[in-house]
Amino acid sequence: MVEQITDKLGRPIRDLRLSVTDRCNFRCDYCMPKEIFGDDFVFLPKDELLTFDEMVRIAQVYTQLGVKKIRITGGEPLLRRDLDKLIYQLNQLEGVEDIGLTTNGLLLKKHGQKLYDAGLRRINVSLDAIDDAVFQAINNRNIKASTILQQIDYAVAIGFQVKVNVVVQKGVNDDQIVPMVQYFKDKDVQIRFIEFMDVGNDNGWDFSKVVSKDEMLEMIEQNFDIEPVAPKYYGEVAKYYQHKDNKAQFGLITSVSQSFCSTCTRARLSSDGKFYGCLFSTVDGFNVKSFMRNGATDNELFEQFKALWNIRDDRYSDERTEQTVANRKRKKINMNYIGG
């Protein structure tokens, strides 16, 4: 039986984000800049990561509190060995209606069929440019956009529902918006443009680098005949639009200009097994991994997860201003640990 719970702001819990690794094969400046995450950077050892059995146990308990959707994140989740086994186990859980994966897409041809066979159907691919030179400058690994586009085509061909996520930075890749809308208009792929956020401690964020939803929409409207689309469900983070001629849709995610804290229903488990109630958390999360490994029962997990959600009052993006960002003294948790 599912117990319906809410946090201090009346928000239910519906989504669980599981970060399966802190490692990534890209070095994008806004997430894992190469100057910090260099060849000598020490990532988490294997025994500090949650095991698949631990993740499944956590997810099973969360379904009793109302979780219906699970998203696998990282780091780059396709670097975690035997990920298809985790997908298969999660798919067996009663109450789980949807499992998704967020990836940079580089390893989709290598692992995609196994993941599909395990029951995964939805993939979000992070692709911040369609121009090879622009994309290579962002990922700092000399990986071409055309390589990722081929991986996306492969994923679509074997049956995945694919969305493309684009983090837009002023003066970096805002010139990619129109060509990317054009490219994906006639593909069976939905593209979403995300306002640049101040996630983690190392991405050099400030307001001047943000391209707002209104600015993005103006660029698109100058080149395409579009119309808005009604939200599909409570807590949907993207504002969707469709082309009038072929009804192909794209989304704009207003993470800075019009925050969606009031409808956020996501719990997060970091790659080292800690609970976070917000992508912008500054307080080190409750250590679920240690709690479990010290002998916690399923009922104790249930009560702990319930208590953590009941006291949740995070609304960072609602409160963000240039001054609050400048004055922030406590470090945020980096995105490769907490998951995007």
From Swiss-Prot:
Protein name: GTP 3',8-cyclase
PANTHER family found in the cross-reference section: MOLYBDENUM COFACTOR BIOSYNTHESIS PROTEIN 1, MOLYBDOPTERIN COFACTOR SYNTHESIS PROTEIN A
SUPFAM superfamilies the record matches: Radical SAM enzymes
Top class in the EC scheme: lyase
Database matches in Gene3D superfamilies: Aldolase class I
Swiss-Prot/TrEMBL keywords: 4Fe-4S, GTP-binding, Iron, Iron-sulfur, Lyase, Metal-binding, Molybdenum cofactor biosynthesis, Nucleotide-binding, S-adenosyl-L-methionine
Function description: Catalyzes the cyclization of GTP to (8S)-3',8-cyclo-7,8-dihydroguanosine 5'-triphosphate.
Residues annotated as domain Radical SAM core: 8-227
Subunit (UniProt): Monomer and homodimer.
CC cofactor note: Binds 2 [4Fe-4S] clusters. Binds 1 [4Fe-4S] cluster coordinated with 3 cysteines and an exchangeable S-adenosyl-L-methionine and 1 [4Fe-4S] cluster coordinated with 3 cysteines and the GTP-derived substrate.
Family per similarity comment: Belongs to the radical SAM superfamily. MoaA family.
Molecular function GO terms recorded: 4 iron, 4 sulfur cluster binding; cyclic pyranopterin monophosphate synthase activity; GTP 3',8'-cyclase activity; GTP binding; metal ion binding; S-adenosyl-L-methionine binding
Cofactor: [4Fe-4S] cluster
Pathway(s) served: Cofactor biosynthesis; molybdopterin biosynthesis
Catalysed conversion reaction: GTP + AH2 + S-adenosyl-L-methionine = (8S)-3',8-cyclo-7,8-dihydroguanosine 5'-triphosphate + 5'-deoxyadenosine + L-methionine + A + H(+)
Phylogenetic lineage: Bacteria, Bacillati, Bacillota, Bacilli, Bacillales
EC number: 4.1.99.22
